[in-house]
Curated annotation (Swiss-Prot):
It is found in: Cell projection, Cilium, Photoreceptor outer segment; Membrane. It comes from Homo sapiens (Human). Belongs to the arrestin family. SUPFAM superfamilies: E set domains. The gene is SAG. Keywords: Cell projection, Congenital stationary night blindness, Disease variant, Membrane, Phosphoprotein, Retinitis pigmentosa. Detected in retina, in the proximal portion of the outer segment of rod photoreceptor cells (at protein level). This is S-arrestin. It is linked to Night blindness, congenital stationary, Oguchi type 1: A non-progressive retinal disorder characterized by impaired night vision, often associated with nystagmus and myopia. Congenital stationary night blindness Oguchi type is an autosomal recessive form associated with fundus discoloration and abnormally slow dark adaptation. Retinitis pigmentosa 47: A retinal dystrophy belonging to the group of pigmentary retinopathies. Retinitis pigmentosa is characterized by retinal pigment deposits visible on fundus examination and primary loss of rod photoreceptor cells followed by secondary loss of cone photoreceptors. Patients typically have night vision blindness and loss of midperipheral visual field. As their condition progresses, they lose their far peripheral visual field and eventually central vision as well. The modification Phosphothreonine is found at T234. Monomer. Homodimer. Homotetramer. Interacts with RHO (via the phosphorylated C-terminus).
Amino acid sequence: MAASGKTSKSEPNHVIFKKISRDKSVTIYLGNRDYIDHVSQVQPVDGVVLVDPDLVKGKKVYVTLTCAFRYGQEDIDVIGLTFRRDLYFSRVQVYPPVGAASTPTKLQESLLKKLGSNTYPFLLTFPDYLPCSVMLQPAPQDSGKSCGVDFEVKAFATDSTDAEEDKIPKKSSVRLLIRKVQHAPLEMGPQPRAEAAWQFFMSDKPLHLAVSLNKEIYFHGEPIPVTVTVTNNTEKTVKKIKAFVEQVANVVLYSSDYYVKPVAMEEAQEKVPPNSTLTKTLTLLPLLANNRERRGIALDGKIKHEDTNLASSTIIKEGIDRTVLGILVSYQIKVKLTVSGFLGELTSSEVATEVPFRLMHPQPEDPAKESYQDANLVFEEFARHNLKDAGEAEEGKRDKNDVDE
């Protein structure tokens, strides 16, 4: 019997994501939709499938994990290429169970106890070489699927021995999009710093620029203070000092598309006269909220009806083929100086230098503390509405009642 909506403060709610096949033969349950890449290891996908034996009628039930790269232009098929490439596929049979049963995770223990004897656990792991979820933001008027890397978990019942995609009854299958999200390594690199000097015509001494950050890794939503020192030994005036956060996205699969997009900008009000020095700190805050309408910005992947953020910096692990990563994302601070010329604005020149840094998610405080046994499990059901393509529109619907017994 379901408990009332009141829950103890000492027993936190934990959302369980649930989706039912059209014929109600299989139901999949996941405890997360974001799975963390800790650099040294990746959080596995653990969940359960609830099977209705009367509806399955002797079929086998499988769960699959697929990682795919989409180029984003479905008409590319015209020139002999496919617009999608599967980077990884794995499949496990959950019903009838095969082989020795593995020890269930804490989440699975709670769900097995809650859902009864027709519930079967599964565990899917990410190989070390897979990329994290990433997509290039489409323009508001764009239609179709976005360019990027996505992950999908699928459960289905079939009587086919090879379980090929075209032989799976769609009414007996259910799928959920998930994300693989990069979190920062525990150790930071050296403090970023860059220096540059330029010699101008008719000036004996150079213009010198130094740019530094106070650390190498910044977290999403964290302000970035940029210290700029301009030493102007020339006879010219530095009229403008601008600092940018630039996102660099390199599509390395199918093509070599290269996107450099400014995602934050600040300008100093001061000028630097001849034979003087200025030190100034400009604070930048790169946020998706300020870039939502801009086509080609790389995001951390997006699940329908849920928000996301700017893409995290790509970590290329040793020995991994970089082309398999699909889209490589990096960030840099660019400081640009506008220097006066002999004829004023008409002959002014611009010089710039860049400092790389990484933008990432912080590591969780202590993932080992997470426990489901004392939590109130709240089911969030994803129903089908207005299916327009094979992607299946998803809409979250939180159950009103807790299911803690």
